[in-house]
Amino acid sequence: MSSHKKSAKEYMGRIRHANNPPYPPKIRRALSCALVFLLSFSLAAGLLIYSDLSGRVNNLGASSLLGRTPPDSYDGRALNILIIGSDSRSGKGNQTLTNNDDPTERSDTTMIMHISKDRSQVNVVSIPRDLIVDIPSCQRSDGSSSEPQRAQFNWAYSIGSLGGDRASAVVCTWKTVEKLSGIRIDESIVVDFNGFSSMIDALGGINIYVPTKIKDQKNSGLELEPGCKHFDGKQALAYARVRHGVKGSDGSDIQRIQRQQAVMGIMMRAALKKNMFTSLNQLYGFVGNGLGALTVSEGLSSVSQLSGLGWSLQSLKPDNLLFLTLPVYEAPFDRNRLLLSEKKAEPIWDSFINDTPLPAGVEVRDGNGNVRTITEQTPASQTPQDSSAPSAAPSQTPETSESTTQESKPVQDMRQSGSLNSELSPEELAELQRKCEARN
């Protein structure tokens, strides 16, 4: 049991207001994807309305639990950011770390965002919540620590949250991701889903093409026929999160991840279409809703650093923002659990660690909503860097050893993952979505 004790208040900081906020410039080239979208919440606040809105960003304060000093600059190096979607359903949209009333809050969505050294490429990999992983011992802010265990991935967040605060939950997920991947995570962002919903409402809703029938009366109450739908924030959130009652779906997390990635892209394109980043009045309301939904690590709570990072990404091309999902297969001991296909995952991890292009054969969804397979090198920094990866490499246990028998039931067909369980091809679905978004 660790003797390291600190109160929650020591971990939960607020960004101080600037004495002289900068005059708001017009951002001429808006960021063009859901990932950078998360960063743009804080970026826009820092550049445009910092004196009022920056106090709404929650500072995680996790460095002392990780035993690290926050980085003082992002210049000249690649960056790996852990993004966690909070599964707290307590009804409070903007929980702070000091009043979190859900001690077993779970991570509903987890992604690693890799920003290349030259800022020309952003790759985002989603980690299924049902993936069985090795969860290391995690120190909590109340002085306790957990035992190492093998369990479902999103348990890491729950195990950490038993310390009574979000910092402990994030750190346990952070350490689990590093152990799984060998990637050194630099920063983290936790997104409260209630804030996600309110931001969609600030857009006036979004248009989504639903490719297949959904009837989930027992869980979400969602009932949808195929076709173009206009969703408010609550409806869009329910659609992004639904797992059961989706025609053609096995109820796994893979198809839900694909829907979430698609909805984030739709949300960002809607913001661009409505000129949210060039109209100060609209930006104020839009960003104001988003900032309260974010809890960030110390490096991202620095407005000067975050502004510089966000500004350096303003020329990012949508084609160079790529979403992908880890290659997994059905666990032989439980059809509702997943195991990592390590041989297929290793080249993906290596591309993040060395800041090199994604490997050929990986299917991705780009910032324009198009699904494609990597056939040649994508633009990125070509010079491998010393990313100071954790000393513990991903472990291979008997439970994760790959064999032809174990992988006979792949959960994710890399050539079909963009179809979202419909009879439509990824290309057909992308075209229908474009037409749907074009409607008023």
Feature map (PLM): residue ranges:
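Non-catalytic, solvent-exposed segments at the cell envelope interface
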Residues: 2-440
